[in-house]
Regions:
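Short Cys/His-rich Zn2+-coordinating modules
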Residues: 142-153, 167-172
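Short functional micro-motifs and their immediate structural scaffolds
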Residues: 173, 194
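Short cysteine-rich clusters marking metal-coordination/redox-active sites
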Residues: 165-169, 186-189
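Cysteine-rich micro-motifs
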Residues: 179-192
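Short, flexible, mixed-charge glycine/proline-rich loop motifs
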Residues: 150-162, 175-180
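Conserved phosphate/anionic-ligand binding catalytic regions in large, soluble enzymes, centered on
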Residues: 10-24, 28
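A structural-propensity feature for long, helix-poor, extended segments
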Residues: 40-84
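Short linear interaction segments
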Residues: 195-223
């Protein structure tokens, strides 16, 4: 099993969110077995916080292999499924940090507003350290709400051909293409957010690409 310091090296720093992801992953692997060599374990994460980096390192579930599935719910909930059995565990964070003092709240507000004074950095570091220590010491039953499940297996990763968008010319995974005005286009162009959409918006405002290039040159000379 991977160690916490390996996860910190991957993520870049230690923080409460990363340590929560570590604890979640340790619990999942204890229940489902060894970390995934390939796609044997599937992780469904309901947030994109620091914790997900720990999940990737600990379980070897990654976006590229298709066994790390992101649900943008903003919830501290993680579900792990074992292939081929469908055995699963759903882990919800139930832990609550100790209440902050008025001074700690003040330091955090100053930090969020951009202050990096020694006083502020020291206070923020101390608070984070206490949270990390609490997460590491708290028992599983007090840290999590657990549900053991049997789940249908998500589809394994598939490789699709790439097709050029007929508006911007960029290669796009075939099932992500859309049809607009009789043309097969990528999602950004379908929604008017792609390169072609930007060009159309510029044209409607009377702005040419030469105007943009000239503005960039002028800005570089001024800097």
């Amino acid at each position: 099993m991977k160690k916490l310091d390996e996860i910190v090296r991957f993520h870049g720093h230690i923080c409460p969110g990363l340590v929560l992801g570590y604890r979640v992953s340790v619990f999942a692997l204890k229940n489902l077995g060894k970390r995934s060599k390939d796609e044997e374990i599937v992780a469904i994460v309901e947030n994109n916080s620091c914790a997900v980096d720990a999940v990737q390192v600990m379980t070897n579930c990654t976006f590229g292999k298709g066994n790390l599935i992101f649900k943008d719910y903003g919830k501290q909930v993680y579900t792990f499924i074992k292939r081929p059995s469908g055995k699963a565990v759903r882990i919800s964070i139930d832990w609550t940090p100790s209440p902050e003092t008025e001074k700690q709240k003040e330091m955090w507000q100053r930090y969020m507003k951009g202050s990096r004074s020694k006083e502020v950095l020291k206070a923020v570091h101390q608070r984070k350290t206490k949270k990390i220590e609490s997460i590491l010491k708290t028992s599983d039953k007090d840290l999590f709400k657990i549900k053991h499940l049997k789940m249908p297996l998500p589809e394994e990763a598939r490789i699709y051909p790439s097709v050029r968008c007929e508006k911007c010319g960029e290669k796009t995974m075939e099932p992500r293409l859309r049809v607009k005005n009789g043309k097969t286009v990528c999602i950004p162009c379908f929604e008017g957010r792609g390169l072609s959409g930007i060009r159309e918006k510029m044209a409607s405002l009377g702005i040419t690409e030469k105007d943009i290039a000239d503005a960039v040159k002028w800005a570089r000379k001024r800097s």
